[in-house]
A protein has these predicted regions:
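Hydrophobic, well-ordered secondary-structure elements that form the walls
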Residues: 89, 128, 185, 229, ...
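Active-site-proximal substrate-binding core of FAD-dependent oxidoreductases
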Residues: 66, 314-319
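Active-site/ligand-binding neighborhood in enzyme catalytic cores
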Residues: 1-51, 58, 254-269
Length: 319
């Protein structure tokens, strides 16, 4: 399937349900949002605040306190805050959760299963800001693959054979005109290419720049990707006003998973239960949700959130 980029499919492993849920959401709903997807985040924040929720940005959980019966009584942050609660829901990467909670809090078999999870591929993303009234708006996504073998194996490439695929998309024009002012191009990138910067960390608020060699690497990969895209869209290069890039390290530092994986962990049709997790954990009042324990994407995390909510309400006696 050309749409395998939506879930980083692997030929002998990926279950059919992953393909079905990923593609079906595009068939039954809008595949693009006027004014961008951040509207969903803004709406969720407003609704949460309307119901009295407090949201804390740039707040990293680093430890739990335990009371009787191995229940969590408090959550401690890197910023020095302590939050006390009777129920804890974690949406962070499940491997990171185990680091925070401690190995001793879980059964050895569960801990081993989590540590054995294999991440999906990560990506190199190229975000273009275009000059006005030059590049026509395309009301559809472009999925390009170098050959048939690349459809399910594009994350495995020789260093001099990059990229093997890409997805090209754009936001609808704000003024409803026929030209776009933005293009986003995604391609798989092997995290091993960034091994020399593995110990670095940088976000808008923390860390330090990764240095000139990293910038040169990103620029070279951006040009490699543009050269391939220009074979199909020869006018695109001349329409670029400026651009910025993201690598697997960018995704790692912002999303918080070990490799910057786009879609959580691989699902294996031959061992389907290895990557399936129920919301309950061995810690009585700790629940998990999100793409690292269920399906990825807006559909996947919504299904996971509803399931976690149902389990929490049932265990609390409300259902």
């Amino acid at each position: 399937s050309g749409a395998s980029f939506l879930y980083a499919g692997v030929t002998p492993q990926t279950p059919l349900y992953v393909h079905t849920l990923s593609v079906n959401s595009y068939i039954q709903s809008a595949y693009r949002l006027t004014k961008g997807g951040s509207q969903i985040t803004d709406l969720l924040i407003r609704e949460l605040q309307r119901y009295g929720a407090h949201l804390y940005r740039q707040t990293e959980v680093v430890a739990f306190s335990y009371g009787s019966e191995q229940q969590i009584t408090a959550v401690h942050t890197k910023q020095g805050q302590t939050f006390r609660a009777t129920h804890i829901i974690s949406a962070i990467d499940v491997k990171q959760l185990l680091q925070i909670a401690g190995k001793q809090a879980f059964k050895p078999s569960f801990y081993k299963r989590v540590q054995g999870l294999q991440p999906t591929a990560s990506a190199f993303s190229l975000h273009l800001v275009l000059k006005p009234n030059i590049f026509p708006y395309l009301p559809y996504n472009i999925y390009w693959f170098k050959d048939n073998d690349s459809v399910y194996n594009t994350a495995q490439y020789a260093t001099n054979d990059f990229p093997l695929s890409y997805m090209l998309s754009m936001n609808p024009p704000k003024d409803s005109r026929e030209y776009t002012d933005n293009v986003t191009i995604l391609t798989y990138m092997n995290a091993n290419e960034l091994q020399r910067w593995q110990n670095s960390f940088t976000t808008n608020t923390e860390g330090n720049p990764r240095g000139n060699q990293y910038e040169v690497f990103k620029q070279q990969r951006a040009m490699d990707l543009l050269d391939v895209v220009a074979q199909q869209f020869p006018t695109l290069k001349s329409a670029i006003a400026h651009y910025y890039t993201s690598t697997p390290l960018t995704y790692r530092d912002y999303i918080g998973n070990p490799t910057g994986a786009l879609y959580g962990y691989k699902k294996n049709a031959n061992h389907i239960m290895e990557s399936v997790f129920m919301p309950q954990t061995h810690i009585k009042n700790l629940y998990v949700t999100g793409q690292s324990v269920a399906m990825h994407g807006l559909v996947g995390v919504t299904i996971s959130a509803v399931l976690t909510y149902q389990i929490l309400m049932r265990s609390s006696g409300f259902l």
